[in-house]
UniProtKB/Swiss-Prot annotation:
GO terms, molecular function: ATP binding; catalytic activity, acting on a protein; glycine-tRNA ligase activity; protein dimerization activity; transferase activity
Record Pfam families: HGTP_anticodon, tRNA-synt_2b
Annotated source species: Caldanaerobacter subterraneus subsp. tengcongensis (strain DSM 15242 / JCM 11007 / NBRC 100824 / MB4) (Thermoanaerobacter tengcongensis)
The protein's assembly and partners: Homodimer.
Protein family (similarity comment): Belongs to the class-II aminoacyl-tRNA synthetase family.
Coiled-coil region(s): none
Gene: glyQS
Role: Catalyzes the attachment of glycine to tRNA(Gly).
Entry-linked InterPro entries: aa-tRNA-synt_IIb, aa-tRNA-synth_II, aa-tRNA-synth_II/BPL/LPL, Anticodon-bd, Anticodon-bd_dom_sf, Gly-tRNA_synthase/POLG2, Gly_tRNA_ligase_bac, GlyRS-like_core
Coarse class of the protein's main subcellular location: cytoplasm
Assigned GO CC terms: cytoplasm
Its EC number(s): 6.1.1.14
Residues engaged in binding ATP: 206-208, 216-221, 290-291, 334-337
Protein name: Glycine--tRNA ligase
SUPFAM superfamilies: Class II aaRS ABD-related, Class II aaRS and biotin synthetases
Length: 461
């Protein structure tokens, strides 16, 4: 019988084992900020590494970029973020709590089991629903809300010593615009022909009204985005290609297919720049949630930046001489919620010799520690430690000499370490060690000088 995975179990494991800590904890914290501990940063880096390998390094089409977080304010005017990047905000007049009106309604609909979609609703329609159904405040139960108003999600700051409109800038709410404004630079210097893509990994910031569910939705987050430019008319073919590519990537690196689904956006849901959008959703303990968004952004962004900047964003086909503004397909995923999905999907409990064994069945490429080395006895520390130091040159490794071997295995199982190497008294004579597999718990004896080759083969992706 499959174990029931709860958010409480995942959060407890993450905090207790050094994956994720509350931000600014010694000062009482800062709501919905998280720091990644020794295991968390390794796991995040592994996720970014395998995304980069599959989407950029191994792709004959794609190249990378690392654009600035702070950009000219006009970038966000052109993209539409200054005018329309907002959520519907309302306050409870009784307890002063703030809510997103659409989420308030969606939670009410879910609770009541109603079959209603509010996608595309105006503020007026949402307010009418709240009044008609007497939707209560989730905090205090009152039905006394302010009118709904727009709340811009961008963090505003200033460059230089004066705080006026000329020095106003924003922390970027997405990495995509840094790619669009560099389209001509990248195309010219890389000499790429359409179709080609530009990818990047970086921090983004959104002043979310109601962040939550641990690291699923935070105000500071990391994105992995690809903007793939193609000829108009070939856009849906590439849209379907990247849609499937993203799903295959998730399954290849360990997510169970039954916990994933495609959700195509209805016409009324589509963003103003999109003609087609599909979300790959994951079945989290709190329900289905967006994991990866794949959007056909058409030529909207390049056209907007061409109009606002005066820079020519057209592409000339080197064979036919045809000029056009390329269409863009965007697969965009958040590293933090991807890490949460991998933790949830990998978490398992089983009974072994009357005890509960907690194990993270992470794909070896994602596991923060690849191998742990144990001496069977402290008398064997010196030889075992030398093996550990040699392996650490090639793999993230841990050394553990305290407690019984069984207890040491359990500690590594809980953090997802795929392999454990034990140096015992026989090792001194036969120059072999025991390697134990995390998932099967099977053990094999292998020559000490073959351990690194064995691990390289097993950890290859």
């Amino acid at each position: 019988m499959p174990v029931k995975v709860t958010m409480d179990k995942i959060v407890a494991l993450a905090k207790n084992r050094g994956f994720v800590f509350p931000g600014s904890e010694i000062y009482g914290g800062l709501a919905n900020t998280w720091d990644y501990g020794p295991l968390g940063v390794e796991m995040k880096n592994n996720i970014k590494r395998i995304w980069w390998k599959k989407f950029i390094q191994e792709s004959p089409y794609n190249v990378g970029i690392d654009s600035a977080i702070l950009m000219n304010r006009e970038v966000w005017v052109a993209s539409g973020h200054v005018a329309s990047f907002s959520d519907p905000l309302m306050d409870c007049k009784e307890c002063k709590s703030r809510f997103r009106a659409d989420q308030l309604i969606e939670d009410y609909i879910k609770e009541k089991g109603l079959d209603i979609s509010i996608e595309g609703w105006t503020n007026e329609q949402m307010m009418e629903f709240i009044k008609e159904h007497k939707v209560p405040c989730p905090k205090c139960g009152a039905h006394n809300f302010t009118e709904i108003r727009k709340f811009n999600l961008m963090f505003k700051t200033y460059v230089g010593v004066t705080e006026d409109s000329k020095s106003e800038v924003f922390l970027r709410p997405e990495t995509a615009q840094g790619i669009f404004v560099n389209f001509k630079n990248v195309q010219r210097t890389s000499r790429k022909k359409i179709p080609f893509g530009i990818g990047q990994i970086g921090k983004s910031f959104r002043n979310e009204i109601t962040p939550g569910n641990f690291i699923f939705r935070t105000r500071e987050f990391e994105q992995m985005e690809l903007e793939f430019f193609c000829k108009p008319g070939e856009d849906m073919e590439w849209f379907n290609y990247w849609r499937q590519f993203c799903m295959d990537w998730l399954v290849e690196f360990g997510l169970k297919r039954e916990n994933l689904r495609f959700r195509d956006h209805k016409k009324e849901e589509l963003s103003h720049y999109s003609t087609a959008t599909t979300d790959i959703e994951y079945n989290f303990p709190f329900g289905w949630g967006e994991l990866w968004g794949i959007a056909n952004r058409t030529d909207y962004d390049l056209r907007q930046h061409m109009e606002h900047s005066g820079e020519d964003m057209t592409y000339t086909d080197p064979v036919t001489g045809e000029k056009y503004i390329p269409y863009c397909i965007e697969p965009s995923v958040g590293v933090d919620r991807l890490m949460l999905a991998f933790l949830v999907d990998a978490y398992d409990e089983e009974e072994v010799e009357g005890e509960t064994r907690v194990v993270l069945r992470l794909h070896p490429a994602i596991a923060p520690v690849k191998v742990a080395v144990f001496p069977l006895s402290k008398k064997l520390n010196e030889a075992a430690y030398k093996i550990y130091l040699d392996l650490k040159k090639k793999f993230p490794a841990e050394y553990d000499e305290s407690g019984s071997i069984g207890r040491r295995y359990r500690r590594q199982d809980e953090i997802g370490t795929p392999f454990c190497v034990t140096y015992d008294f026989d090792s001194e004579n036969d120059h072999k060690v025991t390697i134990r597999d995390r998932d099967t718990m099977e053990q094999i004896r292998i020559d000490i000088d073959q351990v690194d080759k064995y691990l390289e083969e097993k950890l290859k992706f």
